[in-house]
Amino acid sequence: MDDELRDRITEAAETNALLNAVKHDSEAQVGAIMGPLMGENPEFREYGDEIPGVIAPVVERVNGMDAEERRERLAELAPEKLEELEAEDEGEDHPLPDLPSAEEYDTVRMRVAPNPNGPWHIGHARMAAVVGTYKQRYDGEFICRFDDTDPETKRPDLDAYDAILDAIDYLGFEPDDVVNASDRVETYYEYARKLIDKGGAYTCSCPQGEFSDLKNNGEACPHRDKDAETTRSEFEAMVDGEYDSGEMVLRVRTDITHKNPALRDFVAFRMVDTPHPREAAEQYRCWPMLDFQSGLDDHLLGVTHIIRGIDLQDSAKRQQFVYDYFDWEYPEVIHWGHVQVDEYDVPLSTSSIAELIEDGELAGWDDPRAPTVASLERRGIRGEAVVDAMIQLGTSTSNVDLAMSSIYSNNRDLIDDDSDRAFFVRDSDDHGGLVERQIVGGPDAGEPPLHPDYEERGRREIPVTSGVVVEGDDLPDHGDRIWLKGYGCVRHTRDAFEYTGDDIDAVREEGVDVIHWAPADGPALRLRTMDGDVSGVAEPGLRNYDTDDVVQFERIGFARLDKVADDSDTESVAYFTHP
């Protein structure tokens, strides 16, 4: 590649990276711009192996710009493309509405607040996708705060912290701050003391059932009028671990006759005998409830906008009492409905998935049958495809259904151009098992294209001298013909395929089936799918690929290569991506 060509590639890559970043309001990806770059400049294609290294610094530079800088630079390089994009934007109904009162804040600062009791299922990705997209739209800040202050009921999983950060990275975002609530217990104690001094909290030793009866009747418990000094003393005893679980709580003094019983004198702190799994927090026994901890952190960490489930409307109302005591402004709130995901037999529940893994019914969090972010990544689905599908759900208060087909469609657009084609013949009862036949006459090898839309990439050479295997369901009756894709027309005679040399146009007119095949001595491969594992035989060229490469098994679908065997005695493994 000479310097002149390198400069042309660099300039074209910058235009495409800017266009991609501005259009999607996100960072550009090398893979996402390769297709348009090659499509608009066919002369670049012979340098396909070198181009990613040339354009990577360009993409990195574009990603270092803010939204306004990208638009200005695109206007310099390709004003007509920016005009087309703006015309599209004017006619587009953005699924994400503008944030309320965003213009009143110097910096829009939003958070995801996961409970790290396990890696994320697919539904969890929605919050990160939307918060990350708003961050990009407003050039704001993204906080990941682990709300890990329940060491017993929703006990944190130590592996989940990194797993969740990996999931956010997979989706294409990087938090500006990562905070563990369990590192901030002393801060919660400090504000509890201030609240007590303001008359906003009292210690209570009522049995839970007894207090519930009083609360539901709008009656105060005997401890409600306790003075601040006594409350402070008993709270310090809580902090020192002098009470057992259930023996003493600290309540926020609200309105005991409030029309909504859920808002009446709710618990701010309780005693927990189970130590926290994090060594840095294992000494604490007095733990804040989520509404107190989360509300406090939203203010102290400068959160301007909160997105939460419609079922958590009472949380904002409870937290408002605390905010009123401290004379704080409550953040802007968007409530949305729950998301349900189709296609999976496994519940969209962290605890349910964990139980299935523990029972051995799932191999792990990245099992293709699990509705998890880790599973999507291992299957070869790009995070951008997930984000785009989540964004299309909007922020309605109604419950929404996520069709996996929308993720698949997005991902197909991202990977199709770059995915070479390959043959894989499934040895399963569902497809009639494997059938082996010798080829009589004809060429020694088939030569299907690596990609039907990009002939310049070349062809795959698949030998037939050892015979071929096809799926039993594709085997024609004796005397009938089939077209072995990339090889030619054969007639099924006795126990062989006799090469006929018929022209493809004649075959099409007569309705002859076109099928995939593999050499009888091709490498063994196991395809892991949502319906279970399928073994079979692949074409030998598969050994030339690397782990993480995505190919399209013709007539089956896309698959990510998870393990590429380099000898005939070892089975390769691939994960089915989608049709």
Curated annotation (Swiss-Prot):
In chain numbering, motif 'HIGH' region lies across 114-124
Which residue positions does the secretion signal occupy? none
Protein localization = Cytoplasm
Q: What is its EC number?
A: 6.1.1.17
What InterPro entries does the record point to? Gln/Glu-tRNA_Ligase, Glu-tRNA-synth_arc/euk, Glu/Gln-tRNA-synth, Glu/Gln-tRNA-synth_Ib_cat-dom, Glu/Gln-tRNA-synth_Ib_codon-bd, Rbsml_bL25/Gln-tRNA_synth_N, Ribosomal_bL25/Gln-tRNA_synth, Rossmann-like_a/b/a_fold
Q: An example Gene Ontology cellular component term from the record?
A: cytosol
* Swiss-Prot/TrEMBL GO biological process terms: amide biosynthetic process; glutamyl-tRNA aminoacylation
This protein's record includes keyword Ribosomal protein: no
- Top-rank taxon, per record: Archaea
The record's GO molecular-function terms, alphabetically, read:
ATP binding; glutamate-tRNA ligase activity; zinc ion binding
As its record notes, the protein acts as a catalyst of: tRNA(Glu) + L-glutamate + ATP = L-glutamyl-tRNA(Glu) + AMP + diphosphate
Instruction: State the Gene3D superfamilies in the record.
Output: 2.40.240.100, HUPs (3.40.50.620), Ribosomal Protein L25, Chain P (2.40.240.10)
Assigned keywords, A-Z:
Aminoacyl-tRNA synthetase, ATP-binding, Cytoplasm, Ligase, Nucleotide-binding, Protein biosynthesis
Q: Which family does it belong to?
A: Belongs to the class-I aminoacyl-tRNA synthetase family. Glutamate--tRNA ligase type 2 subfamily.
Which PANTHER family does the entry mention? GLUTAMATE--TRNA LIGASE, GLUTAMINE-TRNA LIGASE
State the function annotated in the UniProt record.
Answer: Catalyzes the attachment of glutamate to tRNA(Glu) in a two-step reaction: glutamate is first activated by ATP to form Glu-AMP and then transferred to the acceptor end of tRNA(Glu).
Q: What is this protein called?
A: Glutamate--tRNA ligase
Which classification does the entry list for the species? Archaea, Methanobacteriati, Methanobacteriota, Stenosarchaea group, Halobacteria
